[in-house]
Regions:
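Extended, compositionally biased repeat/scaffold regions that form elongated interaction surfaces
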Residues: 21-278
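N-terminal, polar/Ser/Thr-rich
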Residues: 277-301
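Ligand-binding face of N-terminal immunoglobulin V-set domains in extracellular IgSF glycoproteins
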Residues: 299-326
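Zn2+-dependent metallopeptidase catalytic core
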Residues: 304-311, 361, 421, 428-444, ...
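A surface-exposed beta-strand-loop module
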Residues: 327-392
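Juxtacatalytic substrate-recognition/specificity segment
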Residues: 371, 432, 479-585, 589-598, ...
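Extended, low-hydrophobicity, Ser/Thr/Pro/Gly-biased non-transmembrane segments
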Residues: 373-478
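Acidic/His/Gly-enriched intrinsically disordered linker/tail segments
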Residues: 599, 603-672, 688, 705, ...
């Protein structure tokens, strides 16, 4: 999405006062934490961390959240819960409608228990098994240090006897002989879990945490053990004990106030859970028959089917489809929902996610067939969707209910956000038919290959393979590029089509002139464009409106009619925005990413390769263009932050995700050199084509191709 173009790039080419590109790079040492996604989480963090500022102890959570997500959990009101990850743990809100003043409104997950057992809790009575975490529980060097997985051994996980008053024993075998440096007595036997407390940890629990110890730590799930590890570059003996929610360490070499510390459980858990998304390949296929009513309302009726295979590994009783048009009152009306021949129970989760539940669970490996009938009353055009009555253009972006991904044992869905893009989906196959309810001849452009059209021009058919969603623009006034070759371009095997009003014909031809060379350059430098066609279309929006922006979709790019009056003078943002949108066909359309939690992976990359296109092909325009693209860069959040990470507004979001993200990529390229950098991009594109990448996916490929140490750059912009 090119919201940054409207908000950031329309400013002067000079950096903002006091915020030049050079000063940012020189003064920023480490990326700041993410913002707080809920005031109650912030209040809990502030309360718990008061002792840090006074020097009484070290962090209980960490300097701030580093990741925000909505994770699936059966039985909750919305079907999932808001979580924020910190270095030392995770805070979560299970019932946003509950008593925010309750000490249990914000809770801490049983992260250690899950890492030891290898089972992610995705419901009160349901877990998803991904295998115990083979991550060292403490220290900077994993050699000789037990992992969470090793605590699953029967000799460690089984209940022990009451050893109060005894010397600490270790249950890992000879290589973990208890060192005298951390030899402390056992002072309490926990009847609930069947394990003994080491003296330093019980004193910390009752003296520092007081009546909060159970809420923060949980019960001990293993006996305390002494290990030798590397901390701060030095070999040290520390005492370690695992609890349901936390890991505690005791280091006698530290000052007394910091001898007992929390382990980095939040980081360990996040890396374990999200190292592999465990996304089920559902082989989803969509079919939609869309009937467009007459002007001036353009009421639209849709019959849609969704078919997929239950590859989740267990019986499936529900499905969740993100339904963006439900966001606006009176726009989306569901008439019927059938699952495998049975009328489904419906529920709206976070307002826009349609949950369909059946009384007959679908066995693993079986087919699921969903049939929907719904009506749309298009709103006045705004942003990426709606009806422009003055130009008679109907924008149908994000209009089909779309199956959300199944990841880590549950459906992955989120609330609506005004920031960024509206959802993320697995690559699927679509067959879409669009027609008028009468005999009106429509012209339709959008996602899919080159459309087929009935002789009378009233019915358009699109087939799209391996796309993440679909979008269309409809008008009886469009020039039909299938009948007017001047509204097409050929780039290798790719046919480019332009859908514009007659009075904007030259603008449509200019858009093709701008985008065709970019299509060729990206194909050569990054990897081949994988589809047979690409569509550029105007999507209405009266000329006096300013709350609009260009929008990418698979195999398509829509530009507001209101932008056309601005021209496309070389070097201006209206000149390179079309290139930015073409770049999204590589980053978003082909290589997918969660645009709600990892938006920089498509927006920063699209911004940066656009700049690289200008640098390579228009070197005289590059300095001013690059300055304009990055002049809003800010360090208020990490580049890898998501839309729920506490951004104050769209300006701040764009300045971080687009501008700072592009700056980081530029520093990485300079450190690696052009040859290695582009080899990494080609590797990334080839590896994740048709799949979904993560921040760690891209960073791992950069590290693999780089001879230079990239860590200082990444720490500065991302934080790790």
């Amino acid at each position: 999405m090119s919201i940054l173009v409207v908000i950031i790039l329309a400013q002067t080419a000079e950096p903002r006062a006091g915020m030049s590109v050079a000063s940012i790079a020189a003064t920023q040492v480490q990326a700041p934490p993410e913002g707080f996604a809920h005031s109650a989480i912030k209040a809990r963090w502030e309360k718990d961390e008061r002792g840090v500022t006074s020097g009484q102890r070290t962090w209980m959570w960490g300097p701030g959240p580093f990741r925000t997500a909505y994770e699936p959990f059966d039985g909750l009101l919305q079907g999932n819960h808001l979580v924020q990850y910190f270095d030392k743990g995770r805070l979560e809100i299970n019932d946003p409608s509950g008593d925010a003043q309750s000490s249990w409104f914000v809770t801490s997950g049983l992260l250690v228990n899950e890492m030891v057992t290898g089972k992610i809790q995705v419901g009160s009575n349901r877990t998803f098994h991904i295998g115990p975490a083979r991550v060292s529980v403490v220290g900077d060097d994993p050699r000789g240090v037990p992992t969470y997985a090793e605590f699953l051994l029967p000799t460690r996980s089984e209940r022990t006897v009451d050893l109060t008053g005894k010397t600490i024993g270790c249950w890992f075998g000879e290589r973990f002989v208890q060192p005298k440096e951390v030899d402390r007595p056992l002072v309490r036997y926990e009847q609930v879990s069947g394990h003994n407390w080491a003296e330093p940890f019980w004193n910390f629990a009752t003296g520092t945490l007081k009546d909060q110890w159970l809420q923060i730590l949980g019960y001990p799930i293993a006996e305390p053990c002494g290990v030798k590890t590397i901390i701060g570059g030095k070999s040290q003996y520390v005492l370690v004990q695992l609890f349901e929610r936390r890991v505690l360490t005791y280091n006698p070499a530290n000052p007394s106030a910091t001898q007992v510390e929390m382990g980095n459980v939040g980081r360990h858990y996040y890396n374990w859970r999200y190292a592999d998304m465990h996304e089920a390949d559902l082989d989803t296929k969509y079919n939609a028959q869309i009937q467009i009513g007459p002007a001036p309302r353009r009421t639209t009726t849709v019959q849609q089917t969704v078919q997929f295979t239950n590859t989740t590994g267990s019986n499936l009783s529900n499905a969740v489809l993100r339904t963006v048009w439900k966001r606006w009152d009176g726009v989306f009306t569901l008439k019927s929902a059938i699952v495998n021949g049975e009328a489904a129970r419906t529920r709206w989760l976070h307002g826009i996610n349609l949950e369909l539940t059946t009384s007959k669970p679908v066995p693993a490996g079986a087919q699921v067939s969903i049939a929907l009938i719904f009506e749309l009353q298009p709103r006045p055009v705004g942003g990426r969707t709606g009806y422009d009555k003055s130009n008679d253009i109907l924008g149908l972006g994000d209009m089909l209910p779309t199956l959300v991904p199944w990841e880590n044992g549950g459906w992955s869905f989120y609330p609506y956000s005004d920031l960024g893009d509206l959802g993320y989906y697995a690559a699927s196959d679509y067959s879409v038919e669009i027609a008028s309810t009468g005999s009106e001849k429509l012209v339709v452009g959008g996602t899919g290959g080159i459309p087929t059209v009935d002789v009378n021009g009233a019915r358009w058919r699109f087939n799209a393979t391996g796309v993440r969603d679909v979008a269309y623009v409809v008008s009886p006034r469009f020039i039909n590029p299938l009948a007017d070759a001047s509204m097409t371009r050929q780039v290798g095997s790719v046919k480019m089509l332009a859908y514009f009003l007659p009075e904007h014909k030259s603008d449509g031809q200019r858009q093709l002139q701008l985008t065709a060379p970019a299509m060729a350059w990206f194909s050569n430098e990054i990897g081949p464009y994988p589809f047979e066609s690409y569509t550029v279309a105007e999507m209405g929006v009266p000329l006096e409106r300013t709350d609009n922006y260009a929008q990418e979709y698979p195999t398509a790019y829509f530009i507001p009619s209101s932008w056309l009056r601005l021209g496309t003078a070389p070097g201006t943002w209206t000149w390179y925005t079309p290139v930015h949108e073409v770049a999204h066909q590589w980053f978003y359309s082909t290589v997918g990413n969660n645009q709600l939690t990892d938006p920089w992976l498509d927006e920063a990359l699209a911004t940066y390769v656009t700049a690289e296109y200008v640098r390579a092909n228009f070197p005289d325009l590059y300095p001013a263009s690059w300055s304009s693209m990055t002049n809003g860069a800010t360090n208020v959040r990490p580049v890898s932050a998501g839309v729920f990470s506490g951004f104050a507004n769209e300006n701040q979001y764009s300045a971080t995700i687009y501008d700072s993200g592009a700056l980081m990529l530029d520093r990485i390229r300079r450190a690696m050199g052009d040859t290695s950098f582009y080899a990494a991009l080609r590797d990334y594109y080839k590896t994740y084509q048709g799949k979904r990448a993560t921040t760690d996916s891209l960073l791992a490929i950069f590290h693999r191709h780089s001879k230079a140490d990239l860590k200082p750059i990444i720490v500065q912009y991302i934080g790790y």
